[in-house]
Amino acid sequence: MASRTKRNIWRSKRLIIRPVETSDDDFLQSIYGESSDGYQNATSIVPVPQGTASAKAYRAYLEKCLIGCIICLPPPTTPEDESKPTAPGTTSDSPPKKPAPTPIGAISLSAADANVSHHRNTMVGIHIAPAYQGQGYGSEAVLWALEWAFRHANMHRVEIGAFGYNEGAWKLYERLGFVHEGRKREAMWYDGDYHDLVLLGMLKKEWQEKYGAVKHDGKSA
């Protein structure tokens, strides 16, 4: 059997994936509260101001998922960091205090009830803070979630949904390899009109074919 290259599964090219903490409540509140459009693109519930109770409820939901995590950017590093003088009261052997990663969003894979878990299906949920949208972080996080689902959690199928008016989202998911599986016609009320709910999915074999995943024999697909 060919050996596999060990790597940190909680890192992608530009992102760090970390657990949800109680200290994230303010951040979780902000990613929905900063933009009403972002809130309505991420949830179908009637728009209401998001307070601390909503943030705690969202954190509780993430903690109950198959996996629910905070998406972060790593702290910046510069050559100057390596040459900074030792702070008073420390020795040259003392590790400098590193800045914390910057949270930019949340991602989850839904957990199935025990009596239907044998189907090995899950759904992606993702939200990127408005200031970090349009930079490819959402795509990178979804690709990370797909790899985790298929390679580590042995999922058979991953689905994702988007509201019909959010054309940029569902077209992006199609480019990532999700297959357009159907629409729930006029299922969503938004801004004075009814809109479709677009349903997309990806099978494990489709992911392997598109992304050259590592199979059980340790070789690339």
Where is each model-derived feature located?
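Conserved GNAT acetyl-CoA-binding A-motif
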Residues: 151-161
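A short, well-structured alpha-helix characteristic of acyl/acetyltransferase catalytic modules
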Residues: 1-57, 205-221
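Acetyl-CoA-dependent GNAT
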Residues: 44-133, 203-205, 218-221
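Conserved beta-strand-loop-alpha-helix junction that forms the acyl-donor binding cleft
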Residues: 129, 160-170, 187-190
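Conserved acetyl-CoA-binding loop-helix of GNAT-fold acetyltransferases
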Residues: 128, 134-151, 167-175
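Amphipathic alpha-helical recognition patches that constitute DNA-binding helices
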Residues: 27, 123, 140, 157, ...
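Conserved active-site tyrosine of GNAT-family acetyltransferases
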Residues: 173, 178, 200
